UniProtKB/Swiss-Prot annotation:
Residues 563-576, 585-611 have a biased composition (Acidic residues). CDD domains: DnaJ (cd06257). This is Translocation protein sec63. PANTHER family: SEC63 DOMAIN-CONTAINING, TRANSLOCATION PROTEIN SEC63 HOMOLOG. The gene is sec63.
Length: 611
């Protein structure tokens, strides 16, 4: 069997190759862009209660990567359409092996005629007989003669001829052509300089540049996507206690922000000025402010990671509070939650605070008449808008909290405990009672079933999922994703023992979270604090007290053995008492039977009968 590699001369297979390659890139990117993770069946989109109140001129800073993605998708789909059209309208010329055509005779020719015709062809095309090889080579002549010989054998051999008549494929070595789905002009000598230039461009410039850029990025950027110079600037200034102003100064010194204003002599001071104008809600309409705020989430997330690495609780708290103030544009020295409502001015918020109305639920608990009395300078529509926005602001609620160890009734030294949290989103005036643990909680049947689900799914979350709308942040220059950060603090040492992690998509029903952590290495009673802080809203933080009783394994075993022995003794005493009571009751029954027999006189009946 001979084989031959050749390029796509007809231009049929090369478009197919391009179509497959383009589709492998365009289809997954289209799916991730249009559908994405938000299209999961587990998630439910909720109505955006802030939609009609959001600023119409909200400037959403879109990254260039998304613009390039859409351009790439448009060009990719145009290429897919063009290639599909070209393939659909092309005609493939099939080379079917036909011995009659090779010999140049009509189908159905008799065997004798085939033999006579073959003799004439063999004399004419035998490689040793061909003298004038003009525009041909000896290899081509030999190849042609072999085809003639195979065709002759296919028509003169009875079995082969029968196979060919029945199936159209004689039992002879077939000519197999293995092609390469590339156009023929690639292999032509006059185009070699362009092909070599293309290879040199791809493998000599583009590929080294991409690898170098990736390597440089991995060396100069952290996993939080900030420059290493930013982290080097922050680390020496991390202390046990950092105020909001000090953290704002660290935030402004990041390279991600200072690089946005390269023409400023003192970029940090300039950024601080823009940030203070933003926090005080001064209308500057400065483009640099929009750029700074568009990078704030990335920088603040990195600042939180650095604060967590040091383990101090106070900086972690203040980073999240700074995040809230920047998103809501609230001064650092005036953390009033009611400033998040539209139209409400600072002096009116202070007046409400004097009346002990400082939180969103307290504001919503006011009747319409009280609201009008306390806020007489606002129109009816403005007051209505305030209430609707306040009703749409979510806040996290802890429904239940337990510290448990899998398959163990007690928490022992060195074990891996799990903080089980049942959380939900509350709205309006709904208030969930404060939850705390005293260390005496035990696992219920539901906890055991949930633990089995955790092990099966290898997940830390159970329950419903609900996609929340973007945060109500009219002074922020882009849509902001609502999230809560959960971490556990040891208040005695002011240290973070469970690092913060963010959660989103909290439903109105219930969702259970499982947070594993290491039990202290010594026995005793330990008190912790559970912190749940929002990255979007001021005054919606939750702090719950946790108590954990840790027991020593050896002491616990002795106690359990003593309890087991005590239980056995109690059971034996109960059995002896029961047996003694049974013997006493048997004696009484015997005595009573004897008395009954002595009192019985059969003559009484006889006397009565005689009478």
């Amino acid at each position: 069997m001979s084989s031959e590699y050749k390029y796509d001369e007809q231009g049929i297979f090369f478009p197919v190759f391009l179509l497959v390659g383009t589709s492998c890139c365009v289809l997954p990117l289209t799916y991730s862009t249009i559908l994405g993770p938000s299209a999961s069946k587990e998630k439910k989109n909720v109505r955006d209660p802030f939609q009609k109140y959001r600023p119409k001129d909200l400037k959403v800073q879109r990254k260039s990567i998304f613009r390039l993605r859409y351009i790439f998708l448009i060009l990719g789909w145009l290429a897919i359409g063009f290639l599909s059209y070209k393939i659909a309208n092309s005609r493939l010329k099939l080379n079917i092996w036909d011995p009659y055509e090779i010999l140049g005779i009509a189908k159905g020719t008799s065997v004798d005629d085939v033999r006579r015709h073959y003799k004439r062809l063999s004399i004419k095309f035998h490689p040793d007989k061909v003298r004038n090889m003009v525009n041909t080579t000896r290899e081509e002549v030999e190849k042609h003669y072999i085809e003639i010989t195979n065709a002759y054998r296919a028509l003169t051999d009875d079995k082969t001829r029968e196979n060919y008549a029945l199936y159209g494929t004689p039992d002879v070595p077939q000519h197999i052509s293995v092609g390469i789905a590339l156009p023929k002009w690639i292999s032509e000598s006059e185009n070699s300089i362009y092909i070599l230039g293309f290879y040199g461009l791809v493998f000599g410039i583009v590929l080294p540049y991409a690898v170098g850029k990736w390597w440089y990025g991995s060396r100069t950027y952290t996993r939080d996507h900030v420059h290493v110079d930013t982290v080097d600037e922050w680390f020496p200034k991390m202390e046990t206690s950092l105020t909001l102003d000090e953290l704002l100064s660290l935030f402004a010194s990041s390279k991600e922000l200072t690089s946005l204003v390269p023409n400023e002599k003192n970029p940090k001071e300039y950024i601080l000025k823009l940030l203070f104008d933003h926090l005080n809600r001064k209308k500057t309409n400065n483009f640099n402010t929009h750029q700074i705020l568009s990078q704030s989430d990335v920088v603040l997330n990195a600042l939180l990671s650095v604060a967590t690495a040091f383990g101090f609780a106070n900086p972690v708290d203040n980073v999240l509070k700074l995040w809230q103030h920047i998103v809501q544009a609230i001064p650092l020295d005036a953390p009033f939650p009611l400033l998040q409502l539209p139209h409400l001015l600072m002096e009116d918020v202070k007046n409400l605070s004097i009346r002990n109305i400082s939180s969103i639920p307290q504001f919503l608990s006011l009747s319409e008449e009280q609201t009008k009395d306390y806020l007489p300078n606002y129109s009816k529509n403005q007051l209505k808008e305030m209430r609707e926005i306040a009703n749409g602001i979510p806040r996290i609620s802890v429904v239940a909290a337990k510290v448990l160890v899998d398959d163990d009734e007690y928490i022992t030294v060195g074990a891996i405990a799990n903080l089980i949290l049942d959380l939900k989103c509350s709205y309006g005036t709904e208030v969930v009672p404060e939850v705390s643990t005293d260390g005496t909680e035990t696992a219920t049947k539901k906890d055991e079933e949930d633990a089995e689900k955790y092990h099966q799914s290898k997940d830390v979350v159970l329950g419903d999922v609900e996609t929340l709308p973007y945060a109500w942040a009219p002074y922020f220059t882009q849509h902001h994703k609502t999230a809560w950060w959960i971490y556990v603090v040891d208040p005695r040492q002011n240290r973070v023992i469970v690092p913060p992690f963010s959660i989103t998509d909290i439903p109105k029903t219930l969702r259970t979270f499982r947070i594993p952590f290491q039990v202290p290495p010594v026995a005793g009673t330990f008190s912790f604090q559970l912190h749940i802080m929002s990255n979007s809203y001021v005054g919606e933080d939750v702090i719950s007290n946790l108590t954990m009783i840790v027991k020593d394994t050896s002491v616990l075993q002795e106690q359990l053995q003593e309890e087991a022995v005590s239980d056995l003794e109690d059971n034996s005493d109960i059995d002896e008492s029961a047996n003694a009571g049974k013997d006493f009751s048997d004696d009484e029954n015997i005595g009573s039977d004897e008395e009954d027999e002595s009192e019985y006189d059969p003559m009484d009946t006889d006397t009565s009968d005689g009478e």
